Amino acid sequence: MTELGLGGVYLSPKQIGDPEALVHRAFDLGINFFDTAPLYAGGESQRIIGEALADKPCILATKCGRWSWEKGPYRDLEAYKKQLETSLDILKRDCVDVFFIHEADWAVYWEDMDIPRSRCEVELWDVFDYASSPVTQFLNWAQEQGMIKHIGISGNNSHLLTKVINEYPLRIDALLVAFQYSLIWRNAKETLIPTAKKKDIGVILGSPLQQGKLAVPHPEWLEEPPDWMNADTQQRFRALYEIHRETGISLAELSVRYLLANPDFTSLVVGSTNVAHLEENVQHALAGPLPEEIHNKIDELGKVFPGLWGKDF
């Protein structure tokens, strides 16, 4: 698996003029890991990746779940089977290399009850019978059928993903975590990454730019911060912008080079909306680690947010 992967969230003709060309270019640049999901781009992401990579040797990851906020198909074994069979057909594959539970930190996978949106997340004190849940039965079946190679979980909450990893009965091979480790937010370093390392789980990092919040400087935020930014976070952004100003290195390059220097990560999944951005990300990766002084300054910016969500935005 290459240290840089292409995320499929934005892969649709509505957001990218020629999304298949973008995927082809990623492959030509040496990227061999592609992450998608039935949810992404209303299903277009899987179709585009399937068309672009039909005859290419690469590592494909997709996901199950994420139908709605109610229990519905989450408690239906046949719904999972149908979803996987549809994904394989669209991806033009007989087998998925890495198959994630999409947002495994949602209780709706593990509880046989209707769960309102305010209660969608697992709680640290919850007790679940993971083994009897339909998704676990489905994953067992899918592996036995040779339809998936590696089981993974994904999510956005470090504390709750740690709980699932510690309690889940099946072998977890991969963890895809988003929003929990970046230039500023480092919630995953507290318990999640150490737990994954202890259990020999490969850690794949998603949304390294916090869905655009760390993509480019926003000097106006230093004058009038957005609602999600508290005073402490504002000061960290101020310090980050100063590093950017002093070094002349873009925030995107700082992010890619800083994160790839961490040996705990198997791959960094980045989304691109055009070929130029994709090529820039690859060049950033090829540039190698940041100079030690710059790396250490960014290290000092790291923030572990104490709340269960692990973030303040």
Task: Annotate each PLM feature.
Residues 1-62:
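N-terminal binding-site loop/beta-alpha segment at the start of enzyme catalytic domains
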Residues 12-17, 37-47, 67-70, 106-107, ...:
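Acidic-and-aromatic substrate-binding clefts and catalytic sites of carbohydrate-active enzymes
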Residues 28, 50-59, 89-92, 165-169, ...:
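Acidic (Asp/Glu)-rich catalytic clusters
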Residues 64, 74-101, 106:
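Active-site gating/metal-coordination segments in enzymes
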Residues 104-312:
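Beta/alpha (TIM)-barrel catalytic core signal, keyed to glycine-rich beta->alpha loops juxtaposed to Asp/Glu
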